[in-house]
Every structure is written in C-alpha cells, then in structure tokens.
Amino acid sequence: MSKQTSSSRRQFMIRTGGASAVAALAVSLGERLEAQDAASGGVAINHSVCKWCYRNVSLEDLCTAGKEFGLQSVELLQPDQIKVVQKHGMTCALVSNPVTKTEAGVSVGGIAKAWNRIEHHKALLAAYEKQITETKKLGLDNVICFSGNRDGMDNEQGMKNCAEGLKKLMPIAEKHGVTVTMELLNSKVNHKDYMCDRTAWGAELCEMIGSDRFKLLYDIYHMQIMEGDVIATINKYQSQISHYHTGGVPGRNEIDDTQELNYPAIMKAIQKTGYKGYVAQEFIPKREDKLASLKQGVEICTV
C-alpha cells in the first residue's frame, strides 16, 4: 500500500466514523498501560493522618472532614479513642504507644525512654501486652514503639537490649496478629540522641528479632534529614517497613512545592513495592486553614 493510499484511508476512516475506532484504540492502550502498572505491583495508597498534628481540631471533626476528602484512618490514638473513628467507618492504622512507670518510678514507653534499656523491659512488656490485647479486640493490627535515646549507650549495645526485650514480646504479638512497629526518627533536628535514627540500624534490629510481627515505621521526613536517598532506601528495605509517615523538609510543614521532597514520586515508588498499608500525613500545617492543608497533602499523595 502506498503512503498516499494509507493517508487517504486514515482520512476516510475519520470522516466516516473511524474516529470512534481510533478512540477505542486509545482506550485500549490506556487499559493496557493500567494493566502493566498493576502487574508491576502498583496499588492504591491508603490515607491516614496523625491526630497530634491537629490538636485544635476535635477527633469528631477531623473524622467528618477527613472522610470527605479521602482519609481512611486517624492514627496515634489510644484504644479508648478508637471507637470514635470506627463510628465514622474509619480505622486507626497505627495505635499509639502505652506509657507506664518502672518500679523505680521512671516513665517509660515514650520516645526518649523505651526498649534500649534492660531496666525498662519489665514495665514495657506488661504495658505492651495490654496494648496489643486491646488493639486486637478493636480489630486492629499495628502498634507503635520506640528505641529510646542513647544517653551514653553505644548503638550495638542498644540494639542488643532492644532485641532482648522485644523478642519476649513477639509471642504475644504473633498470637494476636498485631505488628509492633518501631519508628525511625531524626536525631539532628527534632529528637536529639534518639537511637533508632538510621534505616540500616532498624533493619538489623528486625533481623535480630526475627519475627514478621516486628517492623519499621519509615518516616520520610525524618529519614530525609538523616540520610536522604529516600526512594532507594524504600526499595532496599521494603520488606521491613510496615508503615510510612510524611512531612515537608525542611520545617515539617506542608508537603507541597514549598519543600524539597517529591512526594508523588515517593508515593509511586511505595506503590511499586506492592505495599498495602497506610501512608499517614504527619506534617504540622502552617496555614490558617489546617484541614485545607491536610486535604492538599492527601491529594498530593494520591497517585
């Protein structure tokens, strides 16, 4: 067939209704591309938010507003708060940590004093057993934990101590099907001296504990500050990550183009790992309309 004949045929098809055939071909191509994305492991992002960033917004109002723009979860709640989100048809993707006291009267379970000290283990084991049991009763499956600060302790000893205590907790977590998730935090800006401040350290702790019920919370904001290389790190350690948090760098504010991270690209990378959990917005809004900033964050992460 000559080029002239081929061109004339295309023009004839368009004039006589062939345009619909061309459109059908385009749709078919789109469907094929979507199928390729699905085959590569792409899954929808499940959206959550950390309640503490919206202290001046009631939990009821946060659920009502958030559900309208795609939030499925409000997290870092204690068990007695969770029925509120469930009433709205939402969930709590990550239950907050228990805080308790040792026999010596030291408050433990928070960021600074936790699993890297042997003397904290007895109190923490009792508190986490209760928290895990309550989490299971609510139909949930993820509880946050922390390493604690170094306070003069070297990283190797701290890891051994964390592993010793958390190994004792794993039979309880495994029995109830609840994952204990340790957060990676930066020790440069926000949490000076925090021990679990590198992904590789957390991943080695996961290997040492050796249970599918112990994982990491990869906080994108915190790890950008500590080590950068976010997408490559997510790809490398994807099997040891059970949860993600967001935040703009620098400042921990909105995740829009006022900060340096490319969140749509990061979300696409998370999708390609086949991750089926939640990504929680954990930035502190600077704008007067806090919920508008939250809505924007959800939209940015919907890829």
Go through each PLM region and give its residues:
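Histidine-acidic metal/acid-base catalytic patches
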Residues: 2-67, 75, 138-141, 196-218, ...
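Active-site-adjacent beta->alpha loops and helix N-cap segments on the catalytic face
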Residues: 82-85
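N-terminal small/glycine-rich loop or linker at the start of catalytic domains
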Residues: 40-50, 98-114, 149-150
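Active-site acidic/histidine proton-transfer and metal-coordination neighborhood
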Residues: 16-29, 112-215, 225
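A short beta-strand-loop structural module common to alpha/beta enzyme folds
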Residues: 72-78
